[in-house]
Regions:
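Long compositionally biased, domain-poor regions of proteins
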Residues: 156-161, 185-192, 196, 207-215, ...
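Short, thiol/selenol-centered motifs that function as redox-active sites or metal-ligating centers
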Residues: 44-51, 183-190
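D/E-rich low-complexity acidic segments and tails
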Residues: 247-254
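A cross-kingdom feature marking solvent-exposed beta-strand/loop segments within repeated
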Residues: 26, 30, 39, 51-76, ...
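Short, structured motif recognition centered on aromatic/hydrophobic residues
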Residues: 35-43, 73-74, 174-182, 212-213
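Short acidic/histidine-centered micro-motifs embedded in hydrophobic/aromatic stretches
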Residues: 73-77, 92, 96, 179, ...
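Substrate/cofactor-recognition hotspot
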Residues: 81-83
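Acidic, glycine/proline-rich low-complexity segments that act as flexible tails and inter-domain linkers
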Residues: 1-33, 45-46, 50-54, 61, ...
């Protein structure tokens, strides 16, 4: 946490020291930076001022996350958890970044300059086409029709036409943040979809997803963690997809062998 741990005076404080930081954060299945993304998402959504301040400060002070990356995180978080919560989060980022700069002996400055993404041409139709392509690439399915403001301006024009295409975070990092957000949001379809495509795409492994579930459960509760765990268990990974295809092919071969030549529909047609 980039600060000295206080003495544990309650069962909660002892568990935070011994389990949360003594065990979970030290597990090798995710990098500390990956765990930061899950934790920042959870504390920002939990409306807990103290933990938000502490974890934003620790992420910046440790150097695990740079200020430009933190600001990209705020935008991605806003998409999936809403602008009001993200507005508060960005205010915290500003205050904690100023604190970090002062501690480093630097006069606090404003935000780093923003570059216009190379894909932004000002052409709305090009934005929509880019959004359709990004949606299909991220979600491994065709883009929806742009027949409502939510789908056209929101999903295709902004979420996938802009945010997911931005270079400030890797796609894998956006997956981690999104999985944590949809775990929070109590939306069954986005939860299943984003967990499934994160695994099927190969951006996250099953072992990494299991570690995300544990980190998430610690910071947003084991009840919601169970729902996220169930979604991960039900997801189709590249390995299970290959195993399923092999099993189906083997079963078909066995069936054909047992049926013999007379049982083949193709042979029946030739006769």
């Amino acid at each position: 946490m980039a600060t000295e741990a206080p003495p544990a005076l309650t069962p909660f404080e002892a568990a935070a020291r011994d389990f949360v930081f003594g065990e979970v954060w030290r597990r090798p299945g995710l990098s500390r930076r990956d765990r930061r993304w899950v934790t920042l998402t959870c504390v920002a959504a939990a409306d807990a001022p103290g933990p938000i301040d502490a974890h934003v400060y620790a992420a910046l002070r440790s150097g695990d996350i740079e200020i430009a990356e933190m600001l990209e995180f705020v935008l991605h978080f806003a998409v999936y958890c809403g602008w009001p919560k993200a507005s508060h989060l960005e205010g915290v980022v500003g205050r904690q970044w100023a604190r970090v700069q002062r501690e480093r002996g630097v006069e606090p400055t404003g935000w780093p300059p923003l570059d216009v993404p190379s894909f932004e041409t000002g052409d709305w139709n090009a934005r929509l086409e880019g959004g359709r392509a990004e949606f299909a690439d991220v979600n491994l399915m065709p883009a929806p029709p742009s027949d409502t403001p939510y789908r056209q301006a929101g999903i295709l024009g902004f979420v996938f036409g802009n945010v997911w295409r931005r270079p400030g975070l890797t796609r894998r990092e956006r997956r981690i943040i999104t999985v944590a957000c949809v775990g929070i949001d109590d939306s069954p379809m986005p939860l299943r979809t984003h967990v499934d495509v994160a695994l099927r795409s190969g951006d996250l492994t099953s072992a990494e997803m299991d570690e995300i579930v544990l980190q998430f459960a610690v910071y947003y509760g084991f009840a919601k963690g169970e729902a996220l765990s169930d979604a991960a268990a039900a997801a189709v990974t590249p390995a299970t997809a290959v195993a399923t295809a092999d099993a189906v092919a083997t079963a078909d071969a066995v069936t054909a062998t047992e049926a013999g030549p007379a049982g083949s529909p193709h042979l029946e047609e030739k006769r």
